[in-house]
Structure formats: structure tokens, C-alpha cells
Swiss-Prot record:
One MF annotation (Gene Ontology) recorded for this entry: oxalate-CoA ligase activity
Residues with N-acetylmethionine modification: M1
A Pfam cross-reference name: AMP-binding_C
Protein family (similarity comment): Belongs to the ATP-dependent AMP-binding enzyme family.
Keywords: Acetylation, ATP-binding, Cytoplasm, Ligase, Magnesium, Nucleotide-binding, Plant defense
Cofactor: Mg(2+)
Domain characteristics, as noted in the entry: Both substrate-binding domains (SBD1 and SBD2) are involved in the substrate recognition, and are sufficient to confer the substrate specificity.
Residues annotated as binding CoA: R239, G418
Name this protein carries in UniProt: Oxalate--CoA ligase
Induction: Up-regulated upon infection with oxalate-producing fungal pathogens.
Organism: Arabidopsis thaliana (Mouse-ear cress)
Amino acids binding ATP: 170-174, 214, 289-291, 310-311, 315, 394, 409, 500
Annotated spans, SBD1: 241-310
Region spans: SBD2: 311-374
Length: 514
């Protein structure tokens, strides 16, 4: 099968490493690459023959991080259909929007089901099928009757690079999520890029900490590992737990993990309050999906003895765009998201002209991993694909070593009386305060300056900080116009389902408070 498709890459891995561990559910069972491939092939056949799935159909999936999700996700793609993973915590109204916007033809869930998703599917007259795998030697049970169709094998299905494979919605800074269709080629290209930059091989092993309905956990954690012949462990609870994370990492001989900064901070807090007697020797730790403050990077390296590689990614790029290299390939720079990986990247001004090093502009990309455009959104496509490049909406610059530095989202830069303030810079200062665990800066409307800067912080466990403490600290470390006018002390920051802190949502949350 074509290695320009994800399905082809995984078939090649199953032939090359049939007996190596591919997927484990912690404390329950293990699947080899050959066994996983067999389960995927059988499930793909059932989707075609018994569920009536045709090439190009969209199939929605809503599961915790389970083996059934992995099998059914890959079976949908193998059946030449498009997988649309959805957050199991959505309301019925949200499910209705996403199922409708994606034109889903089928809803897949665990045997326990998902009442809001099923309610929405029923309203839209979308069929519902459950999937269950009791143990490693069992057949996958689908809640759809066996047909007498002669199509009993997926071997007749030929996957093509331009087949639709994945449909996701952006969580971006705009209020209306945009639908992002991605192809087999997009997925295969991204998996190859991730494998290459981190030198993933069949000897690697990781534990999934991020939800698999999000592109970060799905591509960087799961698919790149499977595509390298490596091993993936899913937590027994189907989601991240700070309590079981290190025991799982040790039990399954993990060599690396990838997470968002908020998860890294939770892991650090756990290390401070309940340290392990020893930690596994990791090749690297990866951080992506939001800016990692240099102070957090250094704390992670000090605590766990592994290089922390910050990367830069977007749904529209099928995740990875740039990354800091492994130590043997060059320095990793705190505060930088590294060098482009497997694609062209340029800094453009508003006229579409490429900028020289150290000059700021919009980060733009093009390559085989990049979506061809948003679904049914000509306005977003016109703005997003100018001058022959995809426009990320991020402001950044290359240094003279070719490393990318991000300043912030175009829409998140705070314009205080004409002074442009990067909230990322303020975040970094907040996180150097010894008593601050998490912190985020954001812009708010202001009659005098147009916009003013505010921030919210979570104190470290067992400490107390005041608004005056934070302001005084910021005055020592920032120019006067960058010091937050108001500081919210809190024990919780609103996050997206993937653990990202979005400034727009944080600003709304705290502005609603008196």
C-alpha cells in the first residue's frame, strides 16, 4: 500500500514489526502491530459491508482514550471514509452543531454510549454503532448486524493520498470553529515529519496524556508512534491522571512524552508534592500547543533529567510545523519553537514580502502536511491562503540561526495606546515569581488606552500571593506600560478540552466578575 497514505505506513509497520508491542491499555492488555492491523482490517470491512460506509463518508467518533477509539479511528480511514473525532464532554447542542457541520453519516461510541451525542444523532437521523474489545484475543464487537454481503475483507479497498481522512474543527481565537479537512497524504506527511525530527523508532514507547480527539495527542502521541513501529500506552481510566502517569511511564519503559504546558505544570506540581523515588530515563520531553515559559522548561529539565523540546503546531498543518532539535542535532533554545520540519516556512509582511532574520511578521507555511482549505468557508480561505502561503495568524521572527520565535497571535497582541504588548512576554515574567504556579496575561477594553493589560494567576500550593505582590514583581521585571493594571488571584483557569489556556476565554471569564 502507498506510503503516501497513513493506512499504507501502518500496513508496512505491521509487516516489518509484527510481534512488537503497538498498543497497551495500562494494566489490562497489549496488542502487537500485527494484531492491531488485523483488528483494523476487520473493523474496516464491517463498516463497509454492515454499516454501509462509502468512500468520502464522514464518521463521527466520541470515546475516551480507549483501544476501541484507536481501532475504529484507523478503520474508518482504512475504509476510505473520513474520521471526525469529537469531545465526549460536549452538550447535545454542541454535538448537533459538529455532527451537522461535518455531514456525519454515522456515530461511533463505546458500548456505554454517550447520551448527548446519541440525542443529537437521533435528531439528525444519523445511525449509532458501538464498538467493544473485551481483551487482546477477542474479536471487536460492533452493534450492527452482520450482512450477507460478499465484501468481507478490506483488502479490496485501495487508499489514495488525496482521500479525505480526518475532519477537525479549530479551537482558535475566533468564536466560530472552522472545519479543517485533512487527507491521507496530510496525515502521512505529518507522521513522517514527527518521526524524523524526534528520531522515533520501534524502540520508543510513550504514554498518552492528551485527548485523542485533538490533533496534538492524535498525531504526535499516537499516530507518529504507531507509524514508527513504536509502542503507545493508554491510561486505564481513559484520560490523564497525575497519580498514574509516572507508574505507567516506568511500567511500560517510556522513552518520551508530549504534553501541553498546563499538563507539564501539573506534573511538576505532583513532583514537588509527591516525588517518585526514581524517574525513568527519557530521551526527551516535548511541549506544544501553547507557549512554554523558559522557567517551566528549566524546571522540567532539572526535575526529570531530559531535554525539553518546545514545538509549534496547528490543526491546519496536521499538527507539527517546527520544533527544537534533539541535543545531538543542535541546541534547543528556551523561548523558541525551533526550526521548520518538513515544510516551507516564511515570515511575511502585510504585502506578502519575505522578511529578513530578526524582523517580525506573520508566520506562513506551505507543504504536503497543510490542509487545502476550510470547509464551506470562502471568507476564511481567502484570508488564510494569500500570496501562495497558508497564514497562521501568529506573529513571529527567525533569529540568525534559523530558529522561530513567536510573539503572539495577531488578534491577541494587546494594543495599549499604540504600544503593542506581547502577552507571552508577560506570562513568562509571571511564571518566574516563586509563588506562582500558573499565570496568563490578556487584554481588556479600556476607555483611555483602547486596551489595557490584566492577568490571572494561580498561587503555588501552600503559598499566598496578593495583587500588590504580583504588580510589584512585574514592575521590577517589565516596562511600566506592560505591568498588568489588574491581577486576578484564582485557583482555576478556564481551559479548552485539550488543556490549552485561551486568552479570549480567560478574559471573558474574569471580566464577568465584579
Amino acid at each position: 500500500m502507498d506510503s503516501d497514505t497513513l493506512s499504507g505506513l501502518l500496513e508496512n509497520v505491521a509487516k516489518k514489526f509484527p510481534d512488537r508491542r503497538a498498543l497497551s491499555v495500562s494494566g489490562k492488555f497489549n496488542l502487537t502491530h500485527a494484531r492491531l492491523h488485523d483488528l483494523i482490517e476487520r473493523a474496516a470491512s464491517r463498516l463497509v459491508s454492515d454499516a454501509g460506509i462509502k468512500p468520502g463518508d464522514v464518521v463521527a467518533l466520541t470515546f475516551p482514550n480507549t483501544v476501541e477509539f484507536v481501532i475504529m479511528f484507523l478503520a474508518v480511514i482504512r475504509a476510505r471514509a473520513t474520521a471526525a473525532p469529537l469531545n465526549a464532554a460536549y452538550t447535545a447542542e454542541e454535538f448537533e452543531f459538529y455532527l451537522s457541520d461535518s455531514d456525519s453519516k454515522l456515530l461511533l461510541t463505546s458500548k456505554e454510549g454517550n447520551a448527548p451525542a446519541q440525542e443529537a444523532a437521533s435528531k439528525l437521523k444519523i445511525s449509532h454503532v458501538t464498538a467493544t474489545l473485551l481483551d487482546a484475543g477477542s474479536d471487536l464487537v460492533l452493534s450492527v448486524a452482520d450482512s450477507d454481503s460478499v465484501v468481507d475483507s478490506a483488502t479490496e479497498l485501495v487508499n489514495h493520498p488525496d482521500d479525505g481522512a480526518l475532519f477537525l474543527h479549530t479551537s482558535g481565537t475566533t468564536s466560530r470553529p472552522k472545519g479543517v479537512p485533512l487527507t491521507q497524504l496530510n496525515l502521512a506527511s505529518s507522521v513522517k515529519n514527527i518521526k524524523a525530527v524526534y528520531k522515533l523508532t520501534e524502540s520508543d514507547s510513550t504514554v498518552i496524556v492528551l485527548p485523542l480527539f485533538h490533533v496534538h495527542g492524535l498525531l504526535a502521541g499516537l499516530l507518529s508512534s504507531l507509524g514508527a513501529g513504536a509502542a503507545v500506552t493508554l491510561p486505564a481510566a481513559g484520560r490523564f491522571s497525575a497519580t498514574t502517569f509516572w507508574p505507567d511511564m516506568k511500567k511500560y519503559n517510556a522513552t518520551w512524552y508530549t504534553a501541553v504546558p498546563t499538563i507539564h505544570q501539573i506534573i511538576l506540581d505532583r513532583h514537588a508534592s509527591h516525588p517518585e523515588t526514581e524517574y525513568p530515563k527519557l530521551r526527551f520531553i516535548r511541549s506544544c500547543s501553547a507557549s512554554l515559559a523558559p522557567v517551566i522548561l528549566s524546571r522540567l529539565e532539572e526535575a526529570f533529567g531530559a531535554p525539553v523540546l518546545e514545538a509549534y503546531a496547528m490543526t491546519e498543518a496536521t499538527h507539527l510545523m517546527s520544533s527544537n532539535p534533539l541535543p545531538e542535532e543542535g541546541p534547543h533554545k528556551p523561548g523558541s519553537v525551533g526550526k521548520p520540519v518538513g515544510q516551507e516556512m516564511a515570515i511575511l509582511n502585510e504585502k506578502g514580502e519575505i522578511q529578513e532574520p530578526n524582523n517580525k511578521g506573520e508566520v506562513c507555511i506551505r507543504g504536503p502536511n497543510v490542509t487545502k482549505g476550510y470547509k464551506n468557508n470562502p471568507e476564511a480561505n481567502k484570508a488564510g491562503f494569500e500570496f501562495g502561503w497558508f497564514h497562521t495568524g501568529d506573529i513571529g521572527y527567525f533569529d540568525t540561526d534559523g530558529y522561530l520565535h513567536l510573539v503572539g497571535r495577531i488578534k491577541e497582541l494587546i494594543n495599549r495606546g499604540g504600544e503593542k504588548i506581547s502577552p507571552i512576554e508577560v506570562d513568562a515574567v509571571l511564571l518566574t515569581h516563586p509563588d506562582v504556579s500558573q499565570g496568563v496575561a490578556f487584554g481588556v477594553p479600556d476607555e483611555k488606552y483602547g486596551e489595557e493589560i490584566n492577568c490571572a494567576v494561580i498561587p503555588r500550593e501552600g503559598t499566598t500571593v496578593t495583587e500588590e505582590d504580583i504588580k510589584a514583581f512585574c514592575k521590577k521585571n517589565l516596562a511600566a506600560f506592560k505591568v498588568p493594571k489588574r491581577v486576578f488571584i484564582t485557583d482555576n483557569l478556564p481551559k479548552t478540552a485539550s488543556g490549552k489556556i485561551q486568552r479570549r476565554i480567560v478574559a471573558q471569564h474574569f471580566l464577568e466578575k465584579p
